[in-house]
Amino acid sequence: MNKNTWIIGFTLFAMFFGAGNLIFPTQLGLESGHFFWPAILAFALTGIGLPLLGVVVGALDKHGYIGSFNKISPRFSLIFLIIIYLTIGPLFAIPRTASTSFEMSVTPIAQNSGNLALFIFTVIYFLIVLYLCLNPNKMIDRIGSLLTPLLLITIVAMIIKGFVDFSGHSSNYGMTNAYHSNLSGFSQGFTQGYLTMDAIASIAFSMIVVNAIKTTGIQHADKIFKQTIIAGLIAAIALVFIYISLGYIGNHINIPSDTLKELKAKDQNIGTYLLTTMATKGFGTFGKYLLGIIVSLACLTTACGLIVSVSEYFHRILPKIPYKVFVIFFILVSFILANQGLNSVIKMSVPVLSVIYPVAITVILLILIARFIPTKRIAQQIPLIIVAIESILSLITTQGWIRISFIDDLPLKEYSLEWFPIAVVATLVGYMISYFVKQSNIVYQKE
């Protein structure tokens, strides 16, 4: 394993590690109580396992997901990738990184921070993103060898101090009845990890990893696949360590019930409160600044990864427009949306994400199956169409636009996984139908 693989692995970690990856495991630790271990391990399984799988599957074809999706349908490839890149890019995730950085780094320090402060912060934030992203090859090196070590050092410093301050406390009793057994703890952790939606980002980040590996001189798909697995494992190990550590500390922070009630009444994020408590307990007033640095670095690296992946994709389908033009354009769009505030960005994006997320996971699994089982195009098309229809109907019901009664009765609906049994059945039906259809089997390009 050479130096480049380590740099790519650490870059992948940094791109995946956003502010939510700090908040979710810490809050899970508090809520799970005595059932922490099954909850956090299940959280890691879906919160890390699915994104890692998404990155690795993207390396099965020499041309990444573009090549794999084209085998399903060139039209599907174009439409679905445009939706994914715009949704997790300038229309949602990138503006959210800036808004989250502001709310967790500036707001706690400057009590009266308003629209002007947000404007100034986002100008500086996106100028840094612009500098890092204008050259995508240098971006990998800058993040992997500079920003990631700085991010890891600050996180580890807070974790070590957190262990010293809180590990002597007894495990709390949890704050919700959802955790009442090892099985319920596992199912809750599994669902929370799934709901991070990092698997969608893996489709975008996979292209960066594949292209970065190609720049080292590796061109054969099998070797690219092997290096992608190694880089993915490096990122996964770092994420597992941080998730379990933050979750463990959160599990040993005892918050009075009155404080919890007050937080809920104010609709304040409990995970953010726990992180602030951990930072200020360990480092006093400086803790607020330390947490701000950690969150800003985490969000900055994620924003860079998304800007590069989105810009590279659109430059690929519209080669007459230079890559740098796309970078500037998407940063401007993200800047405008970031100044609408965090809550506005989230409200706009959640409905779209709830539709494309099941389709994204389904297509990742279908491509993986096709790697080992002879598969015709129609065997992938049928389950994708059915899952997309179910996801749209589920959204319509959830939003209250039209009441579709059978949607609420679907298995696993309470875990937001009602699409999964449907995907399994549709896949089996698709493979059965494919036996009667004259199509050649899908072959992923290696040379």
From Swiss-Prot:
It is found in: Cell membrane. GO terms for cellular component: plasma membrane. GO terms for biological process: isoleucine transport; L-leucine transport. It holds the Pfam family Branch_AA_trans. The keyword Transmembrane helix applies. The chain crosses the membrane at residues 5-25, 40-60, 74-94, 114-134, 143-163, 193-213, 229-249, 290-310, 317-337, 350-370, 382-402, 417-437. Keywords: Amino-acid transport, Cell membrane, Membrane, Transmembrane, Transmembrane helix, Transport. It is a multi-pass membrane protein. Its main location: membrane. GO terms for molecular function: L-isoleucine transmembrane transporter activity; L-leucine transmembrane transporter activity; L-valine transmembrane transporter activity. The keyword NADP does not apply. InterPro entries: Brnchd-chn_aa_trnsp_Livcs. Component of the transport system for branched-chain amino acids (leucine, isoleucine and valine), which is coupled to a proton motive force. Belongs to the branched chain amino acid transporter family. This is Putative branched-chain amino acid carrier protein SE_1090. The lineage of its organism: Bacteria, Bacillati, Bacillota, Bacilli, Bacillales.
